[in-house]
Amino acid sequence: MNWTMKRYDPAPFWNVPHEWPAQTAFIVAGGPSVLQQDLELLRGRNVIAINSSIYAVPWAQFLYFGDYRWWDEEANRNAIERYQGRTVTTSRLVRHPKVMICQKTNPPGLALQCDSLMQRYTSLTAATNLAAHLVGPGGTIVWLGADGKHAADGRTHHHVPHRWYSKPGCYDQQLTDLVTIVPSLKQLRISAFNASPGTAWHELLPAVDLEEMVGKQRAA
């Protein structure tokens, strides 16, 4: 099949529903610290997987990818064909009946329109924006795998590495966008936490233990 690099302009863009009102959304990003987590704790909860994290949590309700290069790999397209949840992107190069496209906005801050997601240097901002639309005021967002660094052994991801390499300074670039969403979350009255052991982004969001966080949700 010829996957032509042709921009697709959907009209209208997909509107994210307010589907998890005042609930907790867990976002599984790609950082190596995910290997230290018991992901079974998330089964049955509100979960968004970012690109290849879908292989670790195939039962997640949402899959978000922002990079066409990820979609361009046949194994990933096949995974989406098998996936039972909903797939969302901001890439206008994608045209597929199982992929919903939102409008991409630039930083600073999260996009407030429910058909838009903010992304520039990292899919984590867009996935957080997706979660914010889903949970709304009074909701909570918890990051996993938001490490902001490589592991001590040089590992870059908890899953099979992407075929493209991380550029020097990429985490600093990502941080410049991530810091701008913190005021947005406060404005939206959404609590956000980072459950990524050893994260380099410890000053961005309060650090929490995943097991304790899930325990609190069960007790609520």
Residue ranges of predicted features:
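Metal-ion/cofactor- or nucleotide/acyl-coenzyme-handling active-site neighborhoods
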Residues: 1-220
